[in-house]
Regions:
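Tubulin/FtsZ superfamily GTPase core signature
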Residues: 1-327
Length: 327
């Protein structure tokens, strides 16, 4: 699960809530707050891959979800789309957080092609609905991970890799919002890049140290499989760049990073931030988010839900929520 890969000192576990229909999956979650769906209507029997059933299960707990999100400035919803829980519950969670007054960012995975057209359809519908609700959506298609694996990579390792990439995005945005910098990026800046029902967003996080850390970070960013996919999607409309380093960060390093990235995305609106932290002594970390405005199709997909690793998570400074199952 993505939740397991986010565990660590950087993001306190007290900020996580795990949501699932399966009691066994919840018992393995290390979060303090947990919501088990289906204890009433379906008594923990799952969703059978049906998003409408997942939505019905979540409706039973909607007040509980709103209560968790009250007095939270920002809520991260982390989920896999495609199945009953991810597709049915994720948009409802996002709506509950919005109704509680929080700003909402969704981080989602979509299914591999081999998972079938049914799960892909549910994922597309859920993603479309999420874009109408959340302040920003970052989506990682699992299919892109095939660029990183070979024919000997096991199924378990492949899913671990996709979860790791999504966790990387969550940590990158967390740092961006939590490290108050010399040049700050505000939530409104982030939402401006990610918002829009007809936009598609891509991300990469890279880190390096040593004398050539800028060159190394740029190389890692520009060869990141998700950004390579972004380049194939057409002109970039906006790019957000966040740099975090120790007190040894120089103006020349900042200028070089910005020049390289701005040169790669000519014509894009550029938003940048820079922070120094003693936790990043001798290290340079760069988070890059880019957004494309997609052509409007004549027939929009019907809004609805979808997932491949499914566990919504609710989040406060920000608070996080993840769905855990693949039902």
């Amino acid at each position: 699960y993505v939740l397991e890969q986010l565990a660590g000192p950087e993001i306190p576990q007290s900020l996580f809530t795990a949501v699932d229909v399966e009691g066994e999956a919840l018992s393995r979650a290390t979060t303090i707050d947990k919501i088990q769906l289906g204890t009433g209507m379906f008594k923990g029997l799952g969703t059978g891959g049906d998003p409408e059933r997942g939505r019905a299960l979540a409706e039973e707990h909607i007040e509980n979800m709103r209560a968790l999100c009250r007095e939270q400035d920002v809520v991260f919803v982390v989920s896999g789309l495609g199945g009953g829980v991810g597709s049915g519950v994720t948009p409802l969670l996002a709506r509950a957080a919005k109704e509680a007054g929080a700003l909402v960012l969704a981080f989602v995975l979509t299914p591999f092609t081999c998972e079938g057209t049914r799960r892909q359809k549910f994922a597309r519908e859920s993603l479309s609905e999420l874009k109408q609700i959340a302040d920003g959506v970052i989506c990682l298609p699992n299919q892109q991970v095939f660029k990183l694996v070979d024919e000997r990579t096991t199924l378990v390792d492949t899913f671990r890799m996709t979860n790791g990439l999504l966790a990387e995005a969550v940590r990158g945005v967390w740092r961006l919002l939590m490290h108050k910098g010399l040049i700050e990026i505000h939530f409104s800046d982030l939402a401006a890049v990610l918002r829009g029902s007809q936009s598609e967003s891509f991300f990469a996080v890279a880190e390096a140290n040593g004398a050539n850390r800028v060159d190394s970070v740029i190389r890692k960013l520009f060869t990141h499989p998700i950004l390579l996919e972004s380049d194939a999607s057409g002109p970039t409309s906006a790019a957000l760049i966040s740099l975090i380093a120790g007190r040894d960060l120089t103006m020349a390093e900042v200028n070089k990073v910005m020049a390289e990235i701005s040169g790669r995305y000519p014509g894009a609106q550029i938003i940048m931030g820079a922070a120094v932290s003693d936790d990043f002594k001798d290290r340079l970390s760069v988070t890059l988010l880019v957004s494309h405005q997609m052509a409007v199709e004549s027939e929009a997909p019907t809004p609805g839900p979808a997932s491949s690793q499914e566990t919504p998570v609710l989040s406060t400074s920000p608070r996080m929520t993840q769905e855990l199952s693949s039902s």
